[in-house]
Amino acid sequence: MEERDDEKLRISLVGPMHPYRGGIAHFLEKMEEGLLERGHETVPVTFTRQYPELLFPGKTQYVEDAETTADDPERLLDTLNPWTWYRTARHLATLDPDVVVFKYWMSFFAPAFGLIARYLRRRGVRVVTVVDNALPHERRLGDVWLGTFFLRACDGLIVMSDEVEGDLHELGM
């Protein structure tokens, strides 16, 4: 293992980033930019497939303009392929990060994120999640169970609103 400056952290970010479009991807890219500006080392990891294409009829889940100011993320995680969940978890663990930060907004991602978080924590890696939605606005069967499966696997939760904090309390966190 290489020696590192105690004040500078190695932070892995997991979630949608370039080439994916949308506010969540933009948020993670800006978060990475801010961390880099403060001298931290970042390792961004994103999806090979975020959603099945059938969920995007007539439009794309990718940005039209391929330009980004963030580092190119490693595209490892396929939300529909559990083998990539293990591969991503192993890869993140080998990076020896100080912390892995997930971006969470819907229970669809909970199985993959939950498995990865548990794998990392068993290896002594801290896991923190920025939570946009702890519970969906229109709940479906399994949303509560899936959400708690992932969120309970985290060392820390960062909320973006009082409403989300209330939802976490409702879930017993």
Where are these regions (language model features)?
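Nucleotide-activated donor-dependent transferases that construct or modify glycoconjugates
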Residues: 7-21, 100-101
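A short, glycine/small-residue-rich beta-strand->loop->alpha-helix junction that serves as a flexible
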Residues: 15-29, 105-110, 138
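An aromatic- and histidine-rich active-site surface loop
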Residues: 82-88, 101-123
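Helix N-cap/beta->alpha junction signal
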Residues: 104, 133, 161-162
